Amino acid sequence: MTARTLLVMAGGTGGHVFPGLAVARALRDEGWRVVWLGNRTGMEATLVPKHDIPMEYIQFGGLRGKGLLTKLLLPLNLLRAFWQSIGALRRVKPDVVLGMGGYITFPAGMMASLLGRPLVLHEQNSIAGLANKVLAKVADRVLCAFPDALPNSEWTGNPVRAELAQIPAPESRYDHRAGPLHVLVVGGSLGAAALNDVVPKAIALLPEGQRPVVKHQAGAKQIDTLRANYAAAGVAGDTVPFIDDMAAAYADADLVICRAGAMTVSEVAAAGVAALFVPFPHAVDDHQTTNATFLSKQGAALLVQQNELTAEGLAKTLAGLSRTQLKDMARAARGLAKPEATRRVAEICSQLAGKS
């Protein structure tokens, strides 16, 4: 029997690429042939081949923040991307096409629909991007990480790394801990300057006996500044540029302080850990605030806007949190998780491939 073929369309950021990889690996383990369509300048061009997934490329980018010339050339660039997408689809001959987001999904998704290829669309954020809003009108199935992000969609959750769902239940972790709280600060690959500045100062404002044990990840570009900030504040912190084992880091934490990207929010829920979200204030459509609100409005996380984040305020918040309160938040977060997201997205792809 000939192996079925999946074409994954995703690019630009890890929020699109990593969930796509999770589904790609799941279907490949079932014997599928997987090909990835992306942009040569996106992170997918470096990351995806490391997983032994062949690539097809098209040229297409966004308009936000671009000059007048780029906007004037949009029709020509779109026609080129349409043509390149048709070529890729004819070479790959996919049984099903999975769009996970990024600018390149728009021309490729439109051409997949035009050529009669089954199209599955997955929106990672709580507020859908423009490309997915348009593609949702022609897709065979529309899936969302957050409820009602797109009309007529199924809430599947975000595909996250499998080891996060395997972390023991919050009760078995929090109930057996004593001593100072363990706080994990995650700034991402680029770091988060606001967190790097405020957290050490907040820790310094607490009496020594009330200070948490802090692990603070800041990215390679920010790590020297972060270490200088801790030294200037006169407090201890395990400062690292990267964390290789995020599952272990989440499992060890009582509280995570982080941004509110779609994958971060989904990982926090899957891990079952309490979080204090500080949304990136310049995110498109302020979607990080909406992502964080999904958990915070149900008592599963705390939400502080960056313009309200101060050392004094954070110190007061930390001083007022008990491990029991954090356990309750962690339980609520785990209750909102969708641990079978990867499996569900893969199942839907299989269903549509069987009909093609």
UniProtKB/Swiss-Prot annotation:
Superkingdom as given in the UniProt entry: Bacteria
Subcellular location: Cell inner membrane
EC top class named in words: transferase
Catalysed conversion reaction: di-trans,octa-cis-undecaprenyl diphospho-N-acetyl-alpha-D-muramoyl-L-alanyl-D-glutamyl-meso-2,6-diaminopimeloyl-D-alanyl-D-alanine + UDP-N-acetyl-alpha-D-glucosamine = di-trans,octa-cis-undecaprenyl diphospho-[N-acetyl-alpha-D-glucosaminyl-(1->4)]-N-acetyl-alpha-D-muramoyl-L-alanyl-D-glutamyl-meso-2,6-diaminopimeloyl-D-alanyl-D-alanine + UDP + H(+)
Membrane topology: Peripheral membrane protein
A single cellular component GO annotation: plasma membrane
A single GO BP: cell division
Keywords tagged on the record: Cell cycle, Cell division, Cell inner membrane, Cell membrane, Cell shape, Cell wall biogenesis/degradation, Glycosyltransferase, Membrane, Peptidoglycan synthesis, Transferase
InterPro entries noted in UniProt: GlcNAc_MurG, Glyco_trans_28_C, GlycoTrans_28_N
The enzyme's E.C. designation: 2.4.1.227
Pfam family, one: Glyco_tran_28_C
Pathway membership, UniProt: Cell wall biogenesis; peptidoglycan biosynthesis
Annotated binding of UDP-N-acetyl-alpha-D-glucosamine, by residue: 13-15, 125, 161, 189, 243, 288
Gene3D superfamilies referenced in this protein's UniProt entry, alphabetically: Glycogen Phosphorylase B (3.40.50.2000)
Gene Ontology MF term list: UDP-N-acetyl-D-glucosamine:N-acetylmuramoyl-L-alanyl-D-glutamyl-meso-2,6-diaminopimelyl-D-alanyl-D-alanine-diphosphoundecaprenol 4-beta-N-acetylglucosaminlytransferase activity; undecaprenyldiphospho-muramoylpentapeptide beta-N-acetylglucosaminyltransferase activity
Function: Cell wall formation. Catalyzes the transfer of a GlcNAc subunit on undecaprenyl-pyrophosphoryl-MurNAc-pentapeptide (lipid intermediate I) to form undecaprenyl-pyrophosphoryl-MurNAc-(pentapeptide)GlcNAc (lipid intermediate II).
NCBIfam families with a match to the protein in the record: murG
PANTHER family the record matches: GLYCOSYLTRANSFERASE, UDP-N-ACETYLGLUCOSAMINE--N-ACETYLMURAMYL-(PENTAPEPTIDE) PYROPHOSPHORYL-UNDECAPRENOL N-ACETYLGLUCOSAMINE TRANSFERASE 1
Family: Belongs to the glycosyltransferase 28 family. MurG subfamily.
Protein name: UDP-N-acetylglucosamine--N-acetylmuramyl-(pentapeptide) pyrophosphoryl-undecaprenol N-acetylglucosamine transferase
Organism: Cupriavidus metallidurans (strain ATCC 43123 / DSM 2839 / NBRC 102507 / CH34)
